[in-house]
């Protein structure tokens, strides 16, 4: 990874992804074992898991029989007293990063992974308190998802990812028929700023009544390459992390480039910017980087990612959470409990992200704005949120992109308040879209501001604006 403008978020050192593809023929029994219905996918207990009052399921759904592509999912249901709760599909980006690794394990999921992968602790602000949350590793080759066609790893792109994700949903609802017609939402962050609206468009156009799509939500996501570049470079300059000369050079070289496939001139400009920025966490400007040595590779030592806040580190910040999930998901007993790598044939290290998929990404449309316009007109609930300390897809980028839609404002920019009557961020309501910022959060909002993120999620599900100062707020 040479620049912060391409990976969202950056992958760890490249896993032996080709080995993954070559061993997938041996892994395929995972899909077969889960084919008998959702009861076969029930997780009895994860290693090191505390007692819980909700059920979990995980397994494989085959999305392309001919190619042998199977996607891995993890479902964390809401407690019985909260049912029937909505179903929410969560997607992380990259492209090439695992929703199980990030969304489920260090953001909004039910658990946080302990140091050295020793076990799990319950996340007080887990989103499955109010919804049934479905995490999907996509495309094939990410996390535990796999393909029997090795070339798939080198030919992934937006279009196939969206269609495979739709095929996953159609089959998943057959395995879990009690979720048919349930209120359904798609949510995600980062490069899922593409995945979420693209999949939502497919679901909407399908007219499939089983998938009762009500809306989508995107956090710190790529929306429109031109406006995202403008807002990102402005944020860098305003925060003093690039020089005047580099700011001008970035604008000259990059503004009309693809965010995912930049030109050599843009690459060169972002290399200069990266050198000027130094060893900081661009995904959360004011938090520390992980300084634990690693045997994986030198590139993993300089990863700049947001990290987690943990119950045993009250008030402090742990910048090394990725190391913990890597250790945990490489445990054979964990894989067995998850119904992953059923045959034990996986002879490569599970990683949070795939460098190979990321660096060989194919089609990546430069703008999601046409999809936004289509789905706004269709009446879907659409929310966009942004942590205001993210320097990769910063709030300024999101505001420029949303501004390009030209929507009428129904409620002007105002501070919203959390349950402690502290300013949680700011919001503006447009005709057909709600924009929310989260104060002090980075690229992964539920990671740095978990309590405020849960309030945001609750308001989204209820279709209510972010609370003002006089509004009584209850956190689930």
UniProtKB/Swiss-Prot annotation:
<protein>
    <recommendedName>
        <fullName>Serine carboxypeptidase 2</fullName>
        <ecNumber>3.4.16.6</ecNumber>
    </recommendedName>
</protein>
<dbReference type="GO" id="GO:0005576">
    <property type="term" value="C:extracellular region"/>
</dbReference>
<dbReference type="GO" id="GO:0006508">
    <property type="term" value="P:proteolysis"/>
</dbReference>
<keyword id="KW-0732">Signal</keyword>
<feature type="glycosylation site" description="N-linked (GlcNAc...) asparagine">
    <location>
        <position position="347"/>
    </location>
</feature>
<feature type="signal peptide">
    <location>
        <begin position="1"/>
        <end position="34"/>
    </location>
</feature>
<feature type="glycosylation site" description="N-linked (GlcNAc...) asparagine">
    <location>
        <position position="159"/>
    </location>
</feature>
<dbReference type="InterPro" id="IPR018202">
    <property type="entry name" value="Ser_caboxypep_ser_AS"/>
</dbReference>
<feature type="glycosylation site" description="N-linked (GlcNAc...) asparagine">
    <location>
        <position position="148"/>
    </location>
</feature>
<comment type="similarity">
    <text>Belongs to the peptidase S10 family.</text>
</comment>
<keyword id="KW-0964">Secreted</keyword>
<dbReference type="GO" id="GO:0005773">
    <property type="term" value="C:vacuole"/>
</dbReference>
<feature type="modified residue" description="Blocked amino end (Thr)">
    <location>
        <position position="314"/>
    </location>
</feature>
<feature type="glycosylation site" description="N-linked (GlcNAc...) asparagine">
    <location>
        <position position="341"/>
    </location>
</feature>
<feature type="propeptide" description="Linker peptide">
    <location>
        <begin position="295"/>
        <end position="313"/>
    </location>
</feature>
<comment type="subunit">
    <text>Carboxypeptidase II is a dimer, where each monomer is composed of two chains linked by a disulfide bond.</text>
</comment>
<feature type="disulfide bond">
    <location>
        <begin position="254"/>
        <end position="266"/>
    </location>
</feature>
<comment type="function">
    <text>May be involved in the degradation of small peptides (2-5 residues) or in the degradation of storage proteins in the embryo.</text>
</comment>
<dbReference type="InterPro" id="IPR029058">
    <property type="entry name" value="AB_hydrolase_fold"/>
</dbReference>
<dbReference type="GO" id="GO:0004185">
    <property type="term" value="F:serine-type carboxypeptidase activity"/>
</dbReference>
<feature type="glycosylation site" description="N-linked (GlcNAc...) asparagine">
    <location>
        <position position="291"/>
    </location>
</feature>
<feature type="active site">
    <location>
        <position position="190"/>
    </location>
</feature>
<feature type="glycosylation site" description="O-linked (GalNAc...) threonine; in variant 351-AT-352">
    <location>
        <position position="352"/>
    </location>
</feature>
<feature type="glycosylation site" description="N-linked (GlcNAc...) asparagine; partial">
    <location>
        <position position="352"/>
    </location>
</feature>
<feature type="glycosylation site" description="N-linked (GlcNAc...) asparagine">
    <location>
        <position position="472"/>
    </location>
</feature>
<feature type="disulfide bond" description="Interchain (between A and B chains)">
    <location>
        <begin position="290"/>
        <end position="320"/>
    </location>
</feature>
<keyword id="KW-0325">Glycoprotein</keyword>
<keyword id="KW-0121">Carboxypeptidase</keyword>
<keyword id="KW-0865">Zymogen</keyword>
<feature type="active site">
    <location>
        <position position="443"/>
    </location>
</feature>
<dbReference type="InterPro" id="IPR033124">
    <property type="entry name" value="Ser_caboxypep_his_AS"/>
</dbReference>
<dbReference type="Pfam" id="PF00450">
    <property type="entry name" value="Peptidase_S10"/>
</dbReference>
<keyword id="KW-0645">Protease</keyword>
<dbReference type="InterPro" id="IPR001563">
    <property type="entry name" value="Peptidase_S10"/>
</dbReference>
<keyword id="KW-1015">Disulfide bond</keyword>
<feature type="disulfide bond" description="Interchain (between A and B chains)">
    <location>
        <begin position="97"/>
        <end position="353"/>
    </location>
</feature>
<keyword id="KW-0378">Hydrolase</keyword>
<feature type="active site">
    <location>
        <position position="390"/>
    </location>
</feature>
